[in-house]
Amino acid sequence: MRKIVIAGNWKMFKTQAESQEFLKEFLPALEETPQEREVLLCVPFTDLAILSQSLHGSLVQLGAQNVHWAENGAYTGEISGPMLTEIGVRYVIVGHSERRQFFGETDETVNLRLQAAQKYGLTPILCVGETKQQRDSGETESLIVSQLDKDLINVDQTNLVIAYEPIWAIGTGDTCETTEANRVIGLIRSQLKNSDVPIQYGGSVKPNNIDEIMAQPEIDGVLVGGASLEAASFARIVNYL
């Protein structure tokens, strides 16, 4: 049976003080959340240590937003797997479209980060997806297959989550039709050696569409951006019907 993974990606939002205020409202709202749902918060590096303490013993797992492929070294601005696992981080987002778009991430560096994450005991969340131009040109399927082929070289598919994030739906308010998201996620699954890899949908996920999204048979969770920044909003998503 495939695992359900509901992840909030805070991106570059929330100071330590703001993260603590969030938890005061968020954690009590999870008292009746089914235990089999894996809930995680992928937060800025500055929030990781304090949230590791605050989330201890709760249902919520801690995630980071990036990891370098080296154990240590002269890589200014980067962070290593051992640094993350030491403070209780369990998951890490790899290859998010914003990293690819703004910071020069390539399929080759994504692959190195995926391997490093697993080497140091982290579960990576690999993000794949197409732009509006690529979708309009009919390139969605070929692009995603290419990303998977390059990104997953020597990656253990028993310790992996994949997020399908159509780039044109991220932060735009435009949500991919749920049946279309389900179709593309089915395509992703057909390319994998392990059909039990949890595959999430990401892109303008909100309380008013989560139930429809999670009713799709191929979708195993969501990667939530803006709607994860507000406690009541993210709690409603976690507690989908």
UniProtKB/Swiss-Prot annotation:
InterPro entries: Aldolase_TIM, TIM_sf, TrioseP_Isoase_bac/euk, Triosephosphate_isomerase, Triosephosphate_isomerase_AS. It is an enzyme of class 5 (isomerase). One of its GO terms (molecular function) is triose-phosphate isomerase activity. Its EC number is 5.3.1.1. It catalyses: D-glyceraldehyde 3-phosphate = dihydroxyacetone phosphate. GO terms for biological process: gluconeogenesis; glyceraldehyde-3-phosphate biosynthetic process; glycerol catabolic process; glycolytic process. Pfam families: TIM (PF00121). It comes from Nostoc sp. (strain PCC 7120 / SAG 25.82 / UTEX 2576). Keywords: Cytoplasm, Gluconeogenesis, Glycolysis, Isomerase. It is found in: Cytoplasm. Homodimer. This is Triosephosphate isomerase. HAMAP family: TIM_B.
